Amino acid sequence: MTYKPSPRPSYSMPTHIEYNNMKIHKWGDEEAGYVDDWIYISNEKLHQIIFGLKPHSCFKHSKEFRTIFGADELLYILSGIFVISNPETGETHKVLPGDSIFFRKDTWHHGFNVSDEYLQVLEFLSPPPSLGSSGFYAKTKPYI
């Protein structure tokens, strides 16, 4: 599958965003793994999603879907047990529901759901993809 940018929902006024009416964006390919993304807002100021992984599944990276961004990330675990690992350095953290992890731009990361339940993670990315911080930025970095 070829990389294509995710949807960029944006709102000019207070808006009720209903979870049940959201479309799921699928990120990934066979090599990288697949992630479900519920994109709440992604404009020039803010990118906020919930991403999900099936029990005992993971995401890594592939040539098309790289996991290094020109943005800082804050991840808050809603459900499941998340293990995040930097394939470049080997640094690894186990993150439980109610806990968060933060990392700076240019940090490679792989994610693993090591639980029997569906993993959901609240993610904030800054600067947002609309300013060029995600997929196309990742392709400017050396591939590991």
Describe every region a protein language model picked out.
Residues 1-52, 139-144:
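A short, N-terminal "cap"/entry segment at the start of jelly-roll beta-barrel domains
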Residues 44-46, 54-59, 81, 130-131:
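Short, charged/polar surface micro-motifs in flexible loops or helix N-caps
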Residues 2-7, 112-144:
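Double-stranded beta-helix
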Residues 51, 87-89, 114, 124:
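Surface loops and adjacent helix of pleckstrin homology
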Residues 95-114, 126:
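Conserved metal-binding segment of the jelly-roll/cupin
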Residues 35-36, 58-64:
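A short, acidic/glycine-rich surface segment
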Residues 61-64, 68-97:
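A short beta-strand-loop-beta hairpin characteristic of the jelly-roll/cupin
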